[in-house]
Amino acid sequence: MKKQTIAIDTKSVRSDVYGSLSVPLYTNVSFEFDDASLMADVFTGRVKAPDYARVENPTVTNLEYRVQKLSGAAHVTAFNSGMAAISNILFAVTAQGRKIITSRHLFGNTLSLITGTLKRFGVESALCDLTNIEEVEAAADDDSCCIYLEIMTNPQLEVADLKALSQIAHKRGIPLIADSTVIPFTETSLKDLGVDVEVLSSTKYLSGGGTSLGGLVLDYGTFPQINERIKGDLLFNVGAYMNPYSAYQQTLGLETLDVRYKRQAANALYIARELRNIKGIERVTYTGLEDNPFYELARKQFGPTSGAMIAIDLASKEACFKFINNLKLVHRATNLFDNRTLAIHPASTIFGLFPERQLEQMDVRQTTIRLSIGLEDPDDILDDIRQAIG
């Protein structure tokens, strides 16, 4: 059965007693039991059934089950945001005195989590150029607990060799954890490239309409202790499980993800090619362009599509602000992969609290605009960009 059919097929998915064709929304907090013995068996894990909505809910379980079928993951856990998913997977693999090997080019909040929050608890980090395998090998040692990366960085659109990184990780007996938000898991097979755990913000492509927060951890089962810690410890003690309304919306979003993503990716490629011909745009960064330095590696790892994020560089920060202010169709908003096209100036928004020196180290330029391409007609998007450039 093809992935698009699996995403929509409800006959093979856990359903409710009334045979609801669409996923039912369960908003209850607790569940009633027939007797005390059954209640004890459920709460101690001898019988599998929901006991409390902070750790299990049928609507959320439905989403987890569908994602598991689509991805081939051994275990899927849904969290209430992308950052909650990232935090919990890192909580599961690290401890005081351990070291996370990661990129200098991380999403701002992820970088702050690793170098700030976790550092306060005694967790170290090595910020590397993950495209430089020798540098990563030199950073890996007995204290390392994982290699963590984004499969395509935001907004730099840098791509690292996942197989090479997985070999370094597995030589040390540690997992390779990949944030796959930029390319949907339905389009890739990261497990075949040596990725042990995928983490993603389901707020983005799965939500689509920008109406629900969520995050997913897709665990491929190569390190059994990870799922044991997430399901047996962190869900209970951290309390970051996805809320049922988000799961309901994102399950419906999953059913149309294939159609929406392919349109967005096609729009992005068409627009990226045309942007190179617009006077005033000094650089266009998109891995689907044949002259992009990561073009071949991206196609090898992620297939024929390159996602819906484009970075453009203008002459100055002032030119970027003027461009954003002039937009009429494209929205000034910070989400990614919404149905609508969005634009931000990353250096002053999602990286706005970082000092200039650190922005330079992260290759976040004051001249960069990030575009998240939506479902509008691509020529209408281009017309708006042209008039905004002036």
Labelled PLM ranges:
Residues 1-57, 369:
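N-terminal "arm"/small-domain region of PLP-dependent enzymes with the aminotransferase-like
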Residues 7-14, 75-280, 285:
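Conserved PLP-enzyme active-site core in the AAT-like
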Residues 30, 219-224, 314-318:
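Short loop segments at secondary-structure junctions
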Residues 35-84, 109-116:
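Conserved N-terminal alpha-helix of the aminotransferase class I/II PLP-enzyme fold
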Residues 47, 245, 305-309, 366-370:
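Short, solvent-exposed beta-strand edge segments and adjacent coil->beta transition regions
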Residues 115, 124, 260, 318, ...:
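PLP-dependent enzyme catalytic core of the Aspartate aminotransferase-like
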Residues 249-259, 307-315, 370-374:
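Short, well-ordered beta-strand elements within core beta-sheets of diverse protein domains
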Residues 269-328, 332-340, 353-360:
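Conserved small-domain helix->loop->beta segment predominantly found in fold-type I
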